[in-house]
């Protein structure tokens, strides 16, 4: 009998060898990890590892500070 509430764990999208580098200038990549309201999406939803989530948050905040990403979306 299969486990009824068992979900397979997603792997980190930045763990592969050919995965994209997290860079604050890569706005297209960063927008995938920001909600419609401009908030950073938590790692339990995006399945990003803790280390890469910190790098991602730092890159998003840096991009916001220099004006590449908005702080809030109306």
Swiss-Prot record:
GO biological process, one term: translation
Keywords on record: Ribonucleoprotein, Ribosomal protein, RNA-binding, rRNA-binding
The keyword rRNA-binding is annotated on this UniProt entry: yes
GO molecular-function terms, A-Z: small ribosomal subunit rRNA binding; structural constituent of ribosome
SUPFAM superfamilies named among the record's database cross-references: Ribosomal protein S18 (SSF46911)
Cellular component, GO, one term: cytosolic small ribosomal subunit
InterPro entries the UniProt entry points to: Ribosomal_bS18, Ribosomal_bS18_CS, Ribosomal_bS18_sf
TM ranges: none
Cross-referenced Pfam families: Ribosomal_S18
Subunit structure: Part of the 30S ribosomal subunit. Forms a tight heterodimer with protein bS6.
Alphabetical list of NCBIfam families matching this protein: S18 (TIGR00165)
Physiological role: Binds as a heterodimer with protein bS6 to the central domain of the 16S rRNA, where it helps stabilize the platform of the 30S subunit.
Similarity-based family: Belongs to the bacterial ribosomal protein bS18 family.
Name of the protein this chain belongs to: Small ribosomal subunit protein bS18
């Amino acid at each position: 009998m299969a486990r009824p509430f068992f979900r397979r764990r997603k792997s980190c999208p930045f763990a592969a060898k050919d995965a994209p580098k997290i860079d604050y200038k890569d706005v297209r990549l960063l927008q995938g990890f920001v909600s419609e309201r401009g908030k950073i999406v938590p790692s339990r939803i995006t399945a990003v590892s803790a280390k890469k989530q910190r790098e991602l948050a730092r890159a998003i905040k840096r991009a916001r500070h220099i004006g590449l990403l908005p702080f809030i979306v109306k």
